[in-house]
Every structure is written in C-alpha cells, then in structure tokens.
Amino acid sequence: MSFTVVIPARYQSTRLPGKPLADIGGKPMIQWVYEQAMQAGADRVIIATDDERVEQAVQAFGGVVCMTSPNHQSGTERLAEVVAKMAIPADHIVVNVQGDEPLIPPAIIRQVADNLAACSAPMATLAVEIEDEAEVFNPNAVKVITDKSGYALYFSRATIPWDRDNFAKADKAIVQPLLRHIGIYAYRAGFINTYLDWQPSQLEKIECLEQLRVLWHGEKIHVAVALEAPPAGVDTPEDLEVVRRIVAERAQ
C-alpha cells in the first residue's frame, strides 16, 4: 500500500515565531517531523511551506518541498494545492502530519494510512483513550464517538458521551473510556477538493471543528484508537524546551 505524507510548515507562529526551524538536538524541527514520516514507510514525504527560509532548510537536508500560497484560509486549502502541484492521483492516500510534532510515532502515521486503505470512507483519523480526568471536561480536548464499525458519529468539545448516572455524582467518576481525537488525517486525494467545495456547516462553525463538515454532508470518517499515544506538539517556547530535554535524554 502506497501513500504520501504532506507536512505543512508555516514560518509565522504567534507564540513561537520561526517554529519549523527551531533547533532540536542540532536539527530543525521540520527535519525531525520529516524523518519520522519517512520511517513510517511513505512513498513520498512533502513539506508544504510559503516561506523561503523553510524551503532552504528543507533542501539543505535533502527533503522534498512544495511552495504554496501564503493566502490559504485553512490547512486543507494548502493540502489541495500540494495535491494539484505534485500531480497526486485522486485515488492515492495522503496523510497530513502537523509540522510541529517532532516526536510523532511513525507507527501511527502508517496506521492511519492503512486504516483508510482498508475501509470505504474518504477520510480516516485516530484517537486515544482519555486517561486524565481533567481532559474529559476540557473543551480544548476534542472528544469523538463512533459507531460499532469505527466510523465517527460526532466530534465535540463537549463531554461525549455524557454519562448521566455517574456524572450526576459529586466526584463525576469516569467509569468508561472516552476518546480524545488527535489531529492526524488520511485522505483519498480526490476527496480534498470535494471537501473544499462544500460550504462550512453550522455545526462546524459552532464547535470550530472542520471535520464536522464531512459528517454534515453525509460522508464518513474512520476512527481508530492509535497504536501509540503521540507526545504533545510544540506550540510554545515551553513546549520546545520539553522536546529538547526528551531528545537530549534519548541521546545519552
């Protein structure tokens, strides 16, 4: 089974300017993500950027880069441009891996690609069981529920499913596994433009979750529990220091 990984890498970041080029153990962050994706067995790994500094850094370590417009309103629009420019066939599987996850396990990149290949949905993604009770009621932790076949019924920032009897108690004990969505997607390349042709749904606007557009329009998203929980991505200088420490410890 063949698949391509696309890694968006924007230089501008409100909380961490120049994030893709941040040094981690002597390599820019984007190189770490690239190498993790290569270990997943992808046919091609393409870094999508609108910044020449990122382009030069990628070329310096021998990576493949696709320059994209700086005017995209979403990551999906950027992905569509890459598919068009790189002439990726409509039936080919494309995995979108965020450029700020230098420690993402290669196994889950491969997993989401394999899962899409094995099902009839146009999209697939992953989730992890929530172990921290604080996440259950945290709107920044997106929850997902599926049907018996592993297709998403709904994604929400709210707590779903709501355990009526147990949550009625003062301690709101968590007695069943809830799933937190993680932001890795596999697409059939031809579906990306279909998605962009659809108008945003009201649910998508309310929850601020783009994937709800797919469910609103009657398509399916396959969801599986990740083989391995990925470490948190890098959003802040503090996150960057955590990753640097992890890399330094592994090198000892």
Swiss-Prot record:
Location, primary (coarse class): cytoplasm
Entry's localization field: Cytoplasm
Top-rank taxon: Bacteria
EC numbers on record: 2.7.7.38
InterPro entries reported for this sequence: Cytidylyl_trans, KdsB, Nucleotide-diphossugar_trans
Any single Pfam family the record assigns to this protein: CTP_transf_3
Enzyme class of the recorded protein, top EC level: transferase
Cellular compartments per GO CC: cytosol
Pathway: Nucleotide-sugar biosynthesis; CMP-3-deoxy-D-manno-octulosonate biosynthesis; CMP-3-deoxy-D-manno-octulosonate from 3-deoxy-D-manno-octulosonate and CTP: step 1/1; Bacterial outer membrane biogenesis; lipopolysaccharide biosynthesis
GO molecular function: 3-deoxy-manno-octulosonate cytidylyltransferase activity
Entry keywords, A to Z: Cytoplasm, Lipopolysaccharide biosynthesis, Nucleotidyltransferase, Transferase
Keyword Ligase: no
Biological processes per GO annotation: CMP-keto-3-deoxy-D-manno-octulosonic acid biosynthetic process; lipopolysaccharide biosynthetic process
Catalytic activity: 3-deoxy-alpha-D-manno-oct-2-ulosonate + CTP = CMP-3-deoxy-beta-D-manno-octulosonate + diphosphate
Function field: Activates KDO (a required 8-carbon sugar) for incorporation into bacterial lipopolysaccharide in Gram-negative bacteria.
Protein family: Belongs to the KdsB family.
Descriptive protein name: 3-deoxy-manno-octulosonate cytidylyltransferase
Organism field: Vibrio cholerae serotype O1 (strain ATCC 39315 / El Tor Inaba N16961)
Encoding gene per record: kdsB
